[in-house]
Amino acid sequence: MGRHTDVERRTELLDAVVAHLAEHGLADVSLRPMATAVGVSVNGLVHHFGQKDDLVVAALRRVNDVQTEVLGRWLIRNPGLSQADLLRRWWRWINASPANLALVRLGIEAAAMEATSSGLPGVVRADQIAMWRHEIEQRLIGEGVPPAQARSEASLVKAMFTGLVVDLLATGERRRLHQALELGLARLEQIVWASAGLSEPAMPATGRR
């Protein structure tokens, strides 16, 4: 029972840490103000997570887990959802609340920061990109895209999403970015259709919702 309670407490603290990082970013992370913000002592944070860098790594993993859980629920409800439509839903989810956008921003921030600034190992920073790219790649292969092409297309799609999120953070111009997203996903759909030997779908109007 005590072990279960300890795990629950760790999860509660981790969610609070994620919320704090989502608001304040990864630059100049310090345990003392973070502990104050989440209502625990510095020793309490160290007890559950180890040193600062270990805590940030755990928080980033939690950020990814939250997003994969969202995607997983969509796929359980609709197993036949195409990769392009899954990405459309993901974009809508990102835009649904500032909290969702902040979670996605954390992964991009972690990937972009140098190790000297973040203290994060290179593999952790690379994983912020590689994990999502791999998921997209595997789903494209499942839709019939040849593996080598799926790898390249997944890299392109992940780069597109990263750029769209950065643009959104900087400009807030959702309509323009939605139109750009639809152009990119229409191209992806054409590739999937062509790989299946089907007629390519017509490019949608850029105002598609």
What are these model-predicted stretches?
Residues R61-T68:
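Short, basic, alpha-helical segments at the C-terminal edge of helix-turn-helix-like DNA-binding modules
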Residues D85-L86, P98-L120, A126:
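Amphipathic alpha-helical segments used for helix-helix packing
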Residues E12, A16-E23, V70-W74, L106, ...:
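Solvent-exposed, amphipathic alpha-helical segments
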Residues A96, M113-T116, K158-R176, L188-L198:
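Amphipathic C-terminal alpha-helical segment
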Residues P79-G80, T116-S118, Q128-A154, Q190-P201, ...:
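Hydrophobic alpha-helical bundle segments that form small-molecule/ligand-binding pockets
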Residues A58, L71-V104, E153-V157:
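Hydrophobic alpha-helical connector segments
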Residues R9-E12, A16, H20-A58:
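Helix-turn-helix
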Residues L103-A111, H134, P147-L168, H178-R187:
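Hydrophobic alpha-helical segments that form the core
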